[in-house]
Amino acid sequence: MEPFTMHRGVAAPLLRINIDTDAIIPSREMKRVSRHGLAEGLFAGWRYLAGTDRSPDPLFVLNQPEYTGASILLAGSNFGCGSSREHAVWALKEFGIRAIVAPGFGAIFHNNCVRNGLLPVVLPMATVQALADDCAAAPATRQVTVDLRQLEVVSPAGARYGFTLGSEQRQMLLEGLDPIALTLKLASSIDAFQGADRLRRPWIHFDG
């Protein structure tokens, strides 16, 4: 998994509240076995004009020229609520989103983000709106910096906003560790425990 230390990119505002995982990627877009190719279905209900063969809706933010290549999403509260489908995170990642800034996330979605190297940043709605306003006022760049090492977000105008993240989740992102890789870092401790437990309770260990 690619480590996340600091990222600077175009931030696109999608400030609707309660954007659920079915809106992020509708179930009809999940007919493939592989996680690859899901970016095409990201926000499919909003990105494409209804009744067309995937003609882009020019009013949807990610289709607007000024947000081409957006890699940071500014969102409303409770982003990623709904079902536990990990496809929502996979689609965002494949599209190029590296961080999402919102007042809150669905709990399972938040964990899925960390497990897949996508940084969920929790900031008050007023701060998210201020970031969106700063981006709108700086049309030449619309660049926001998200620094996981310093735990801060920097607006195009230079305003700095601190955020928090659990220490284990921060370690996973900084070092690019999925849950298995994080567990393997404790391999020596696990082996030591098993060795001691084998001596203490030999009857529960089967070596045959």
Curated annotation (Swiss-Prot):
One of its GO terms (molecular function) is 3-isopropylmalate dehydratase activity. Its EC number is 4.2.1.33. The keyword Acyltransferase does not apply. One of its GO terms (cellular component) is 3-isopropylmalate dehydratase complex. Keywords: Amino-acid biosynthesis, Branched-chain amino acid biosynthesis, Leucine biosynthesis, Lyase. It catalyses: (2R,3S)-3-isopropylmalate = (2S)-2-isopropylmalate. SUPFAM superfamilies: LeuD/IlvD-like. Heterodimer of LeuC and LeuD. This is 3-isopropylmalate dehydratase small subunit.
